[in-house]
Amino acid sequence: MFDNEVTEIMNYYLDIETTGLDPLHAKIITIQYMELERNTAKPIAPLKILKEWESDEKTILKKFISDSGIADGYKFSFIPIGFNLQFEHSFFWQRCISNGLQPIDIFNRPFLDLKTVAVIMNRGEF
């Protein structure tokens, strides 16, 4: 690693709430994320909840992008952990486009989708 590169791996619980299931027409109303300890997955920082009703959707998306590290070039600065991350991915991607922002691609970095883990633990059943 070079001296000026970030070398920490940061795991984050990630979840969103929306007004519907279609990212073209529904909007994100909350973004929740919390930094987790890498080895134990225990919370090491407070849960952050960005609320659309306190500002607007574009503002919470911009705040999430700027504060979380999700858009950093260093892929390990924000490793999302959540259940059914495809849902979050489709909303982040489309709602950023709808709000004139650079789309967030949470699958262009390491991630852990707990839905996959649950299916495996349930012998392939969902």
PLM region descriptions:
Residues 1-70:
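Conserved RNase H-like, two-metal-ion catalytic cores of nucleic-acid enzymes
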Residues 27-32, 36-45, 74-126:
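Metal-dependent phosphoesterase core characteristic of DEDDh/y 3'-5' exonuclease domains
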